[in-house]
UniProtKB/Swiss-Prot annotation:
It comes from Agalychnis lemur. It comes from the Eukaryota. The keyword Secreted applies. Antimicrobial peptide active against S.aureus (MIC=8 uM) but inactive against E.coli. Also shows fungicide activity. Also inhibits growth of B.dendrobatidis zoospores at high concentrations (above 25 uM). Shows anticancer activities since it is cytolytic against HepG2 human hepatoma-derived cells (LC(50)=35 uM). Is strongly hemolytic on human erythrocytes (LC(50)=40 uM). Its main location: secreted. GO terms for cellular component: extracellular region. Transmembrane segments: none annotated. This is Medusin-L1. GO terms for biological process: defense response to bacterium; defense response to fungus; innate immune response; killing of cells of another organism. It is found in: Secreted.
Amino acid sequence: LLGMIPLAISAISALSKL
């Protein structure tokens, strides 16, 4: 489950760039 944290961070950062 800890492996999904970087994916969530990258997804949030990608959404914030929109």
